[in-house]
């Protein structure tokens, strides 16, 4: 294969998800875009499940570059993949996101229309997926964002830069300094803020579809919003962005249940833990008896409570989070 013919590099970090990775690779082999024109860079982040043996032996119609590293997190793995990429464009695709046949072609079409773009594809719920209730909630919230962007309720921004399915010029990643390897979660959003300062255009691409075979434990799901909350404050502080102002305004727009729960339970460790345990069991019961949609408001409340606790902890406590206007809004809920 002539390396000069490669126009786009698919970069996929992976960690002990061989079965899912095999499905992703099979879908990449079935792309409508010529396999001579793209490569796939797999970065194993310390996998111990046979990923290395499989990737080193499998034959694919495209160039497959396999890289093994000690476990260092997804940011480090993506940086390693970008460094090895030969294409002028980089497409980040997670190891549990199965691409539709035209995914690569659709990303490329939008880049050909205009340079300096970040193309944001979708991570849709697969019709054959059996998701945990909290993961089903997460997917529902993601697809709610997609509908909002499609209908013009809001434009695509740095906050929708999810590296499960997104593409941009390799030189833009390098110019922004790559992923910050200190962060194990939301490292994609942090990079997006730096990309935004370079004047890139974020564009939503609903036709660049991927199917997200998501799986995570409830304990992992519960930790995620807390880290997001802390990271939002860290990102704002380090990049001199008024994210706390954004977070407070967003809080004021939350529903009454969420605002009341946060007002009552923020920084109340024992009470908060009890409430989370009760809400978790109630959500499972409602999901089982009444169906997935009935549990969504409860999972939203759990997620938001954990997120705002992360915000408050990074700020130094609830008093630092609740400004006068926020206090009034919460007590009126």
Where are the predicted features?
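Glycine-rich, basic loop-to-helix element that forms the pyrophosphate-binding segment
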Residues: 69-85
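Short aromatic/hydrophobic "clamp" motif used to bind/position activated sugar donors
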Residues: 90
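Non-catalytic, C-terminal membrane-associated alpha-helical segments of glycosyltransferases
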Residues: 227, 245-333
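Short, flexible, basic/aromatic active-site loop/helix in glycosyltransferases
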Residues: 122-123, 138-158
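N-proximal low-complexity "stem/linker" segments adjacent to membrane-targeting elements
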Residues: 1-30
């Amino acid at each position: 294969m002539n390396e000069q013919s490669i126009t786009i590099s698919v970069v996929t970090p992976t960690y002990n998800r061989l079965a899912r990775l095999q499905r992703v690779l099979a879908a990449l082999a079935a792309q409508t875009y010529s396999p001579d024109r793209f490569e796939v860079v797999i970065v194993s982040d310390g996998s111990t499940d046979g990923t290395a043996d499989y990737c080193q032996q499998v034959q694919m119609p495209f160039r497959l570059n396999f890289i093994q590293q000690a476990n260092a997190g997804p940011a480090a793995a993506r940086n390693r993949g970008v460094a090895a990429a030969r294409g002028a464009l980089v497409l980040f695709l997670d190891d549990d996101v199965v691409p539709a046949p035209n995914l690569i072609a659709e990303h490329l079409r939008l880049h050909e229309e205009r340079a300096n773009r970040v193309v944001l594809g979708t991570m849709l719920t697969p019709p054959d997926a059996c998701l945990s209730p909290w993961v089903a909630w997460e997917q529902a919230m993601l697809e709610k964002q997609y509908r909002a962007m499609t209908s013009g309720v809001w434009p695509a921004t740095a906050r929708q830069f999810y590296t499960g399915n997104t593409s941009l010029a390799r030189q833009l990643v390098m110019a922004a300094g790559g992923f910050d390897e200190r962060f194990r979660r939301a490292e994609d959003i942090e990079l997006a803020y730096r990309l935004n300062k370079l004047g890139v255009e974020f564009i939503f691409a609903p036709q660049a579809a991927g199917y997200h075979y998501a799986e995570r434990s409830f304990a992992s799901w519960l930790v995620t919003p807390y880290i997001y909350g802390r990271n939002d404050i860290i990102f704002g502080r380090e990049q001199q962005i008024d994210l706390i102002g954004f977070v407070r305004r967003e809080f004021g727009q939350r529903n009454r249940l969420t605002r009341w729960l946060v007002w009552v339970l923020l920084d109340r460790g024992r009470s908060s833990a009890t409430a989370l345990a009760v809400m978790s069991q109630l959500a499972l019961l409602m999901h089982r008896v009444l169906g997935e949609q009935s549990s969504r408001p409860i999972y939203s409340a759990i997620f938001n409570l954990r997120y705002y606790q992360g915000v408050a902890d990074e700020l130094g406590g609830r008093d630092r989070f609740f400004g006068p206007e926020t206090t009034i809004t919460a007590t009126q809920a």
